[in-house]
Design a protein with these regions (language model features):
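Charge-rich, low-complexity segments
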Residues: 1-117, 126-136, 140-174, 183-191
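Short cationic amphipathic helices and targeting signals
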Residues: 119-124, 195
Length: 195
């Protein structure tokens, strides 16, 4: 007799149960996040479906309970296109850095996605400020030109965690020295607190 247990730990199941998906990417515009996605995985497919259908009811329920549901978007460098292992390694490193700095109780990662232009890390946060501060700290150590947090609410504006595009333009126009930047602008903090 094989000793096979059908008992399942619900917490373990939720922690490790991911649904992989593929889709046809659409042209991404400046106001539409995630339409460039062609592959991803998620632990909460209903949240992704609601976002793509522009239905904020689920996100509203989370927000009413003090939970922020969103994702970090960042551009994929040209040299990483088609290199799924390197893309996943970066996402894993970002998750580890956020967890280490913000704490395990601050966030639960739901999965991520790869698009034609951007990578995405999906999560729900109980302490959004700690999560975004941790992400911003990690991202400033990378060479990425920008990274943003966006709620799973399509009509919301992004909160930029990193934006070197202005620095680059300023440096090209004024001086060869890079400009210093703060992690979150006062406007971004107000938006985050309103969530």
């Amino acid at each position: 007799e094989a000793e096979l247990s059908l008992d399942s730990d619900a917490e373990d199941y939720l922690e490790h149960s991911y649904l992989a998906y593929e889709r046809e990417p659409q042209d991404i515009s400046d106001t539409s996040w995630r339409f460039d996605v062609y592959t991803g995985s998620t632990r909460l497919p209903s949240l992704l479906s609601a976002y793509m259908e522009n239905d904020a009811a689920l996100v509203n329920m989370y927000h009413a309970d003090g939970i922020a549901a969103g994702f970090i978007a960042y551009p994929l460098p040209e040299d990483l296109h088609g290199k799924s292992e390197e893309i996943l390694d970066f996402r894993d490193t970002l998750m580890e850095a956020i967890t280490e700095t913000a704490g395990e109780d601050a966030v639960s990662f739901l999965g991520g996605a790869t698009g034609t232009g951007c990578g995405y890390l999906d999560f729900i946060a109980w302490d959004l400020r700690a999560v975004l501060d941790a992400a911003a700290h990690f991202l400033t150590e990378t060479t990425l030109p920008w990274a943003a947090f966006h709620s799973f609410r399509r009509d919301a504006n992004p909160i930029y965690l990193l934006d070197r595009t202005e620095e680059k333009n300023d440096a090209e126009q004024e001086s060869p020295a890079p400009a210093a930047s703060s992690l979150l602008s006062p406007a971004a903090i107000k938006k985050m607190e309103a969530m």
